[in-house]
Swiss-Prot record:
A divalent metal cation 2 binds at residues 65, 224, 228. Keywords: Metal-binding. This is GTP cyclohydrolase 1 type 2 homolog. It comes from the Bacteria. One of its GO terms (molecular function) is metal ion binding.
Length: 262
């Protein structure tokens, strides 16, 4: 199957025009006419993932996070980014990334995280200007009230999360939840305005959390990796089911959270 045909499938599922303005998505490295027999799915294009692709003979790495986020001034082995790009080219491995467009789209990562947690479909926090059914973040009203601790236990069991950070009252009864996969602290204000009692996200920082905790918002920082990788595996099934039967779709074993707990 030609790479360009696979790209058309991905972009039909996650249209490029849904990406955020700061983002860079699409074909990062590659030849659209290349024949693809194996696709490796990963959250990030790490050196370990590139090695994994090389060893298994995968001609395409499909990631959520773009390798080329900002334009590099040079591509040399002096930098980590340069080494990765050179390794991809040397080993004839193509790289495609679908990021905030896949977060935003109806049925994408935001909606799928809501689904995995067993909540009803929510309203969109920040609607896309080009598609009223897409956008970043979801706010859901619970059909059955839950405490913060009960929601934490639900997240742990649903996503396989062992540890997470929280700010708030474990015994507070929650009626409305905001959910933003990945880095979501920029949406704390929106969550509060929309009446959320609690927000589930990753990558929060001290001062944001301190201020919004004082304002009465419970915060669950489940980690960037935990809020996206299990969700990406599920949502990528939509790509897998549309591939030709002779194309193998493989979930990376080297996709790992860079953080560890001690």
């Amino acid at each position: 199957m030609k790479l360009n045909d696979i790209i058309n499938i991905i972009e039909d599922i996650a249209p490029v025009n849904l990406k955020e303005g700061f983002d860079n998505v699409g074909l990062m490295v590659g030849d659209r006419e290349k024949n693809i027999t194996k696709i490796l799915l990963a959250l990030d294009c790490t050196e370990e993932v590139i090695k994994e692709a090389k060893e298994m003979g995968a001609e395409l790495i499909l990631t959520h996070h773009p390798l080329l986020f900002r334009k590099p001034s040079t591509i040399t082995t002096d930098t980590l980014l340069g080494r990765k790009i050179i390794s991809l080219i040397k080993n004839d491995i193509n790289l495609y990334s679908a990021h905030t467009n896949w977060d935003s789209v109806k049925g994408g990562l935001n909606d799928t995280l809501v689904e995995i947690l067993g909540f009803n479909k929510g309203i969109i926090m920040d609607k896309s200007p080009v598609d009223s059914e897409a956008g970043i973040g979801r706010v859901v009203e619970l059909t059955k009230e839950m405490t913060v601790l009960e929601i934490i236990n639900l997240i742990k069991s649903s996503l396989g999360v062992k540890n997470l950070r929280y700010a708030g009252d474990l015994n507070e009864v929650i009626k409305k939840i905001a959910i933003v996969n990945g880095s979501g602290q920029d949406f704390f204000g929106d969550a509060k305005k929309l009446g959320a009692d609690l927000i589930i996200t990753g990558d929060t920082t001290y001062h944001f959390v301190s201020d919004y905790k004082e304002m009465g918002l419970n915060i669950l920082d489940i980690g960037h990796f935990n809020s996206e990788w299990p969700v990406l595996i599920k949502v990528s099934e939509k790509v897998k089911e549309r591939l030709d039967s002779d194309v193998e779709f493989i979930v990376s074993k080297e996709a790992k959270d860079p953080f560890e707990f001690i």
